[in-house]
C-alpha cells in the first residue's frame, strides 16, 4: 500500500517523540493529530498545550481536541479523515469500538511495558517502583478491553539501577518510535501477524494515587528507593519534616541511596548529616537523602538544606512522615 493515511493520537512528550518519528516516515502521511484538550497548569492556572499539540504545530499537522468521542460529530470528523491506521500513544482517552473500527487497517497502540504485564495507565512508573530490572515496549492492535489486544511487536529494555521513571520515559519513547515504524512497514507490506496476549499473566498498572506519593519510612530502604525513583520526576515522592517547636516542612525527596546500615532510631527519624547526605531510619536499613526540594523552593543538595535549616541543632533533628502534624 502506498501513501498510508495516518491519524495520530497522543498527549505527553512520550507521545510527541513517536509523532515526530511517524511524521518523518516516508511510507505515509500523518493527516491529523488528536490530543487532549488544553488544561490549566502552573500557579497561574494558564491553559497549557500538550506536547503533542506543540509538536503537531511545528510539523504543520492539523490538531483536533475532543473531550471524548461520545458525540457523533467527533466520530464523523475522524471518519472523514479516511485513516488507514490509527497510531495511539499515551492519549489518555478511552476509544469506543466505533472509533477503533474506523481505520481501513488497524488501530495500533504503543504501550510502555511487555504486555500482558502492566496493563493500564502507569506501566513505566510501576515497573520502576516495583524494582524491576527489565521492562519494554509493545505494539498492539487496540480493542475495547484495556490494553488487551493482540500484539505485533515487542522489545525488552533494561532498567538500570540509577534510572527513574523520567529517564525510562525517554528511553522507551525512542524504542517505541522505532518499533512503531517497524509495525507500520509490516502493515503497509501486508506482513502484520498478531499474537494474542496470555491473560493469565496480566496485571494492572493503575494510575498513581495521591496517597502513594507520600513516602512510608517503615518500608525497607531499597523499597523506598525504588518508589522514589518511580515517582521521579512526576508526581514526586513527598514527606513532611516535623521538628519540635517548629512549623512542619513539606519536602519532595529526590533519589538518594539506600544503605545497608542498621538504624538506631524509629522509622522516619532524621538521624544526622553524614558524608553529604541526611540519614533517615527506615523499617530496614537507612536511606541517605542527597537532594530534596522544600515546598516553595528549588531543588537543593541535602547539605545546603542542612546548613540553612538544621545546622546547630542536636541530632536527631526530627521525624519524617506522610502526615502533617
Predicted feature residues:
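N-terminal Rossmann-like dinucleotide-binding module
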Residues: 1-43
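Short beta->alpha connector loops
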Residues: 12-14, 67-70, 91-93, 259
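Amphipathic, non-transmembrane alpha-helical secondary structure
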Residues: 16, 20-24, 76-79, 97, ...
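N-terminal glycine-/serine-/threonine-rich beta1-alpha1-beta2 phosphate-ribose binding loop
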Residues: 26, 40-84
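Donor/substrate-binding cores of folate-linked one-carbon enzymes
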Residues: 36, 85-211
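A generic structural signal for well-ordered alpha-helical segments
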Residues: 55-56, 132, 232
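Internal anion-binding site segments
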Residues: 199-325
Amino acid at each position: 500500500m502506498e501513501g498510508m493515511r495516518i491519524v495520530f493520537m497522543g498527549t505527553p512528550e512520550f507521545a510527541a517523540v513517536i509523532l515526530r518519528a511517524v511524521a518523518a516516515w516516508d511510507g505515509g502521511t500523518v493527516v491529523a493529530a488528536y490530543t487532549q484538550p488544553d488544561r490549566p497548569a502552573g500557579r497561574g492556572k494558564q491553559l497549557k498545550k500538550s506536547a503533542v499539540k506543540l509538536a503537531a504545530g511545528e510539523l504543520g499537522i492539523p490538531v483536533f481536541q475532543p473531550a471524548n468521542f461520545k458525540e457523533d460529530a467527533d466520530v464523523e470528523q475522524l471518519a472523514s479523515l479516511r485513516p488507514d491506521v490509527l497510531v495511539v500513544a499515551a492519549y489518555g482517552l478511552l476509544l469506543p469500538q466505533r472509533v477503533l473500527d474506523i481505520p481501513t487497517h488497524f488501530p495500533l497502540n504503543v504501550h510502555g511495558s511487555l504486555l500482558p504485564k502492566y496493563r493500564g495507565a502507569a506501566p513505566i512508573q510501576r515497573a520502576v517502583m516495583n524494582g524491576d530490572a527489565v521492562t519494554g515496549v509493545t505494539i498492539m492492535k487496540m480493542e475495547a478491553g484495556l490494553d488487551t489486544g493482540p500484539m505485533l511487536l515487542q522489545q525488552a529494555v533494561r532498567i538500570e539501577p540509577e534510572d527513574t521513571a523520567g529517564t525510562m520515559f525517554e528511553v522507551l519513547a525512542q524504542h517505541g518510535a522505532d518499533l512503531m515504524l517497524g509495525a507500520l512497514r509490516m502493515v503497509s507490506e501486508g506482513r502484520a501477524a498478531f499474537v494474542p496476549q496470555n491473560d493469565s499473566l496480566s496485571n494492572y498498572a493503575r494510575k498513581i494515587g495521591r496517597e502513594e506519593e507520600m513516602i512510608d519510612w517503615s518500608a525497607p530502604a531499597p523499597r523506598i528507593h525504588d518508589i522514589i525513583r518511580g515517582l521521579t520526576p512526576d508526581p514526586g515522592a513527598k514527606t513532611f519534616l516535623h521538628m519540635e517547636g517548629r512549623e512542619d516542612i513539606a519536602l519532595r525527596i529526590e533519589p538518594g541511596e539506600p544503605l545497608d546500615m542498621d538504624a538506631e532510631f524509629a522509622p522516619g527519624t532524621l538521624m544526622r548529616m553524614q558524608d553529604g547526605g541526611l540519614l533517615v531510619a527506615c523499617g530496614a536499613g537507612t536511606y541517605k537523602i542527597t537532594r530534596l526540594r522544600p515546598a516553595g523552593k528549588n531543588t537543593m543538595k541535602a547539605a545546603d538544606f542542612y546548613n540553612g535549616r538544621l545546622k546547630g541543632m542536636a541530632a536527631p533533628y526530627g521525624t519524617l512522615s506522610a502526615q502533617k502534624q
